[in-house]
């Protein structure tokens, strides 16, 4: 383990990510697997890398994340928030840049609960006139 580690927690939908940033060459490891192997989608990889690319710190830090719960999209969002928070611990001067881009805001949108009498949150059973 590295001597200096910066920590950030990210949440999105039902996913929770614990992110550790340490000085390194820019490797991103998620649940002990490389980023490209874990997600397999370029769009999700881009989402995870956004805070690093915006601040120009992609090659300065190695990122290690443990993420659980939710789906892959929620997990990517949780890791993104965790990375942004860890970067602020590493360098508080990055805060205005990340804040302006909206990377420090926890996305409050959650799955709406199912109501009785309906099939899903809003989907009503099929209606027959006759």
Swiss-Prot record:
Gene3D superfamilies: 3.30.230.10. Residues 111-130 have a biased composition (Basic residues). Coiled coil: none annotated. It holds the Pfam family Ribosomal_S9. Keywords: Ribonucleoprotein, Ribosomal protein. One of its GO terms (biological process) is translation. InterPro entries: Ribosomal_Su5_D2-typ_SF (IPR020568), Ribosomal_uS9 (IPR000754), Ribosomal_uS9_bac/plastid (IPR023035), Ribosomal_uS9_CS (IPR020574), Ribsml_uS5_D2-typ_fold_subgr (IPR014721). GO terms for cellular component: cytosolic small ribosomal subunit. One of its GO terms (molecular function) is structural constituent of ribosome. HAMAP family: Ribosomal_uS9_B. PANTHER family: RIBOSOMAL PROTEIN S9, SMALL RIBOSOMAL SUBUNIT PROTEIN US9M. This is Small ribosomal subunit protein uS9. It comes from Pelotomaculum thermopropionicum (strain DSM 13744 / JCM 10971 / SI).
